[in-house]
UniProtKB/Swiss-Prot annotation:
GO cellular component terms, semicolon-separated: acrosomal vesicle; intermediate filament cytoskeleton; nucleoplasm; nucleus
Name under which the protein is recorded: Dual specificity protein kinase CLK3
Regulation: Leucettine L41 inhibits its kinase activity and affects the regulation of alternative splicing mediated by phosphorylation of SR proteins.
Composition bias type Low complexity, residue spans: 117-130
Any single GO BP term: protein phosphorylation
Species per Swiss-Prot/TrEMBL record: Mus musculus (Mouse)
GO molecular function (one): protein serine/threonine kinase activity
Annotated ATP binding sites: L162, G163, E164, G165, T166, F167, G168, K169, V170, K186
Length: 490
């Protein structure tokens, strides 16, 4: 049976200017976890003159979810943001495509090192016909230059390319030490800051592996890691597409409610496990949630008079722990990708596990409607959107924040007659207004989302409480079980 080999690759991680740099503060730089934005010119501001409801369906969803100008401005600078790549990443990074092998004339751009063999002489002679004898080579940006048919560690045979990002690249390999099992091998650039960030992620993945020996908590587990001539390499199981990529390829048709319910239950289950082990993911978004198998069937939607893709298996895995933070570690001021960032982070009031709960609420809305709930890239506008959709920000949060420049006499400073103000007024409405139906299960979903989107993190529902919510009463026994046949042991 065909199994999709693509991993996630939303788009590159670049920032358009230092103004929009997000995740790590300068205090984290000395810990090796500061991410650096690429130097790009800011994109043109989107038009604010049209009502959201009057924009044609596909155009509106492109503007509200897939627009590169928005998804690049406030991306998480996690080095693993393209941990599970796909062909989309290669199309969006023309300037970063691999250069061909350098000639001697251009050898000064490359760092060449003689390949070392860890096998015995007899093993080398037996496998010499399979392995390339050429030297290890990096391009000028520190990416490992590799081709299909190359081997790493005399164990991993490269059979395909899955994507490339700021952090490095992901290739599909056959693991000859485990019966030619298929793996996704993440190869980090030979650059100090990315190498150190990879070590931090490996540490988190090792902790998860220790706590989840039975592989039942739905986190992507690391099967192996090694240092290949300065390139940190992490091997993962090969999974399907990420949930955003599938949504995009389905023309942003929302997921059916039963699919939303099953994915929501798995998300709450996985993140409760992390939270119980004093770990906050901090970068939850549809790109970091992968289908185990993204095979689909095509169905005709009579209501919309179009064909839709319906994924056959809604089992998911949570990925990208490059920004995960333990309770005892330093908590940087800014975390989470803009669209999924909670108010306590914007107001710089400190954050903890409830940060992830807010992100899940935003993700569920996106699954349900096909576009993001908060489509913005600026703090003040983001807060105004929150108030339009969820009600007023609690006064005690306003009094505590250092960001008093956003407020005057206890209210947000905002000009509703500006183009931005008119856009927010026309396109943001109370949360329940987005319900597609008034049936009980839709009402229950919106009740769960509203409790996840409480302004005050102390009042926000916990994931242990969320798993008991009536919305999940409609799950089948099979959907409530978490069986795993994975064997990620090294």
């Amino acid at each position: 049976m065909h199994h999709c080999k693509r991993y996630r690759s939303p788009e590159p991680d670049p920032y358009l200017s230092y103004r929009w740099k997000r995740r790590r503060s300068y205090s984290r730089e000395h810990e090796g976890r500061l991410r650096y934005p690429s130097r790009r010119e800011p994109p043109p501001r989107r038009s604010r003159s049209r009502s959201h409801d009057r924009i044609p369906y596909q155009r509106r969803y492109r503007e509200h979810r897939d627009s590169d100008t928005y998804r690049c401005e406030e991306r998480s600078p996690s080095f693993g943001e393209d941990c599970y790549g796909s062909s989309r990443s290669r199309h969006r990074r023309r300037s970063r495509e691999r250069a061909p092998y350098r000639t001697r004339k251009h050898a000064h751009h490359c760092h060449k090192r003689r390949t070392r063999s860890c096998s015995s002489a007899s093993s080398r002679s037996q496998q010499s016909s399979k392995r390339s004898s050429r030297s290890v080579e990096d391009d000028k940006e520190g990416h490992l230059v590799c081709r299909i048919g190359d081997w790493l560690q005399e164990r991993y045979e490269i059979v395909g390319n899955l994507g490339e990002g700021t952090f490095g690249k992901v290739v599909e390999c056959l693991d000859h030490a485990r019966g030619k099992s298929q793996v996704a091998l993440k190869i980090i650039r030979n650059v100090g800051k990315y190498r150190e960030a990879a070590r931090l992620e490996i540490n988190v993945l090792k902790k998860i592996k220790e706590k989840d020996k039975e592989n039942k908590f739905l986190c992507v587990l690391m099967s192996d890691w090694f240092n290949f001539h300065g390139h940190m390499c992490i091997a993962f199981e090969l999974l399907g597409k990420n949930t955003f990529e599938f949504l995009k390829e389905n023309n942003f048709q929302p997921y059916p409610l039963p699919h939303v319910r099953h994915m929501a239950y798995q998300l709450c289950h996985a993140l409760r496990f992390l939270h119980e082990n004093q770990l906050t993911h901090t970068d939850l978004k549809p790109e970091n949630i992968l289908f185990v198998n993204s095979e689909f069937e095509t169905l005709y939607n009579e209501h919309k008079s179009c064909e839709e893709k319906s994924v056959k298996n809604t089992s998911i895995r949570v990925a990208d722990f490059g920004s995960a933070t333990f309770d005892h570690e330093h908590h940087t001021t800014i975390v989470a990708t803009r669209h999924y960032r909670p108010p306590e982070v914007i107001l710089e009031l400190g954050w903890a596990q409830p940060c992830d709960v807010w992100s899940i609420g935003c993700i569920l809305f996106e699954y349900y409607r096909g576009f993001t709930l908060f489509q913005t890239h600026e703090n003040r506008e983001h807060l105004v959107m929150m108030e339009k959709i969820l009600g007023p920000i609690p006064s005690h949060m306003i009094h505590r924040t250092r960001k008093q420049k956003y407020f005057y006499k206890g209210g947000l400073v905002w000009d509703e007659n500006s183009s931005d103000g008119r856009y927010v007024k026309e396109n943001c409405k109370p949360l329940k207004s987005y319900m597609l139906q008034d049936s009980l299960e839709h009402v229950q979903l919106f009740d769960l989302m509203r409790r996840m989107l409480e302004f005050d993190p102390a009042q926000r529902i916990t994931l242990a409480e969320a798993l008991l919510h009536p919305f999940f009463a409609g799950l089948t026994p099979e959907e409530r079980s978490f069986h795993s046949s994975r064997n990620p042991s090294r």
